[in-house]
Amino acid sequence: MKISKEQVATIARLARLDLDEARLERFAGQFGDILDYMDMLGAVDTTDVEPLYSPSEHGTVLRADEVHTHCTREELLANAPESDGQFFVVPRIV
């Protein structure tokens, strides 16, 4: 599937990425290769294949959730460059 540089530029703009022309061209080719591969996978006949959610037959082994208090709030806030009461102060992003 052919992806244009304009489509890649739109994706980059939405992702807040600044890409030069060379990268737009390279990524257009890479996206096209990925979509071609997805088309090839979609064409595989899976009629007699039983659905599964994991290639492993073993269930997930999880540990029990246990609450551990390692540090007090004051100890954590003492490591912060800036705090306000019980909150970390971080730079504004938007």
Swiss-Prot record:
Keywords: ATP-binding, Ligase, Nucleotide-binding, Protein biosynthesis
Catalysed reactions, semicolon-separated: L-glutamyl-tRNA(Gln) + L-glutamine + ATP + H2O = L-glutaminyl-tRNA(Gln) + L-glutamate + ADP + phosphate + H(+); L-aspartyl-tRNA(Asn) + L-glutamine + ATP + H2O = L-asparaginyl-tRNA(Asn) + L-glutamate + ADP + phosphate + 2 H(+)
Annotated Pfam families: GatC (PF02686)
Signal peptide range in chain numbering: none
One of the protein's GO biological processes: translation
Catalytic activity, EC: 6.3.5.-
Gene3D superfamilies noted in UniProt: Glu-tRNAGln amidotransferase C subunit, N-terminal domain
GO MF annotations in UniProt: asparaginyl-tRNA synthase (glutamine-hydrolyzing) activity; ATP binding; glutaminyl-tRNA synthase (glutamine-hydrolyzing) activity
Domain of life: Bacteria
Function: Allows the formation of correctly charged Asn-tRNA(Asn) or Gln-tRNA(Gln) through the transamidation of misacylated Asp-tRNA(Asn) or Glu-tRNA(Gln) in organisms which lack either or both of asparaginyl-tRNA or glutaminyl-tRNA synthetases. The reaction takes place in the presence of glutamine and ATP through an activated phospho-Asp-tRNA(Asn) or phospho-Glu-tRNA(Gln).
Known partners and oligomeric status: Heterotrimer of A, B and C subunits.
Record NCBIfam families: gatC
Family membership noted in the UniProt record: Belongs to the GatC family.
Protein name as catalogued: Aspartyl/glutamyl-tRNA(Asn/Gln) amidotransferase subunit C
